[in-house]
Regions:
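Charged DNA-binding/catalytic regions of mobile-element recombinases
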Residues: 1-186
Length: 186
């Protein structure tokens, strides 16, 4: 089907659509500010040990408070492991006073359909960020930068147990100290 430019122009005049930048509806930033209490983000980052073993760390971060939860770390994040971590986090989120409604994640292959199903079963809508758009999950990406700069770049990690102890100490510190640079946390 071929549509001429004149037809497109005519339809756009008849319909109340403005230019792309001026259409109605909230921007991504406005959406996040309005729903900050009910949004969490999830992401992975990797850490290489001194024995050249790559470990994958799964974490969740709340948008409003910037509170971070360590889900776990493993050398092999297969479907079974990732789904089990999702179950454990979903169980703790059920005790939240403010219900979580949205989970933002990237399109990493490690996030399997069963991972998403755990959250959908609890009524949490899973929002996948656009391809190659790390800014869409900026809160999680910024946390990865923070933990690398303030902790992991200064240490030689021996194994998974050493990494988990280190991360738990950093997460406890991070959750006690106010790192939130925005007014969302106020």
């Amino acid at each position: 089907m071929i549509v001429s430019a004149t037809t497109v122009k005519k339809v756009l005049r008849e319909e109340p659509l403005g230019p792309a930048g001026k259409r109605k509806g909230p921007s991504w930033r406005e959406f996040l500010r309005a729903h900050a209490k009910s949004v969490i983000a999830v992401d992975f980052f990797t850490v290489d040990t001194v024995w050249l073993q790559r470990l994958y760390v799964l974490f969740f971060i709340e948008f409003e408070s910037r509170r971070v939860r360590l889900a776990g770390c493993t050398a092999h994040p297969d479907e079974r492991w990732v789904t089990q971590q999702a179950r454990q986090v979903a169980w703790t989120l059920a005790a939240h006073e403010e219900p979580v409604r949205f989970l933002i994640r990237d399109r990493d292959w490690k996030f399997t359909p069963s991972f998403d199903a755990v959250f959908r079963a609890d009524g949490i809508r899973v929002i996948r960020t656009p391809i190659r758009a790390p800014q869409a999950n900026a809160v999680a990406e910024r946390f990865v930068r923070t933990i690398r700069q303030e902790c992991l770049d200064w240490l030689l990690i021996m194994n998974a147990g050493h990494l988990e102890r280190t991360l738990q100490m950093f997460f406890d510190h991070y959750n006690r100290v106010s790192y939130c640079p925005t007014r969302l946390c106020a």
